[in-house]
């Protein structure tokens, strides 16, 4: 364990964009591309990405600080949104430096080729943080934590949440 500064908790060092297109009322995976020219300052980051134009509604899934998540996993075009989300996971290696993050945005109008498409996406950390504070005085009782329980069925960090995402 260790302490992360506020900057380290919010820093985004790399981002992968997974593009899903609506087909028969459901989103299906099409392709992914890496964010370029990433600039991270304070609580925000800006980047550029080359995306294919489409008039169909799209959903952009963003994986920030994704580590080795795509080293052995590349979703196949046509996969469902749930399958893609379930497959995105990374090891704990490097997680103490920059926390893995996830965000998504639906773009009902699709992506236009003749103009710059700009979006603001809130990112959710894949790792929870709990701060415990106790004010101490001369007659304070000591703080004792009986137990801390964390559950993870494997050795991977799950980037995308299971339930609907609403930061």
What are these regions (language model features)?
Residues 1-167:
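Sec-type signal peptide cleavage vicinity
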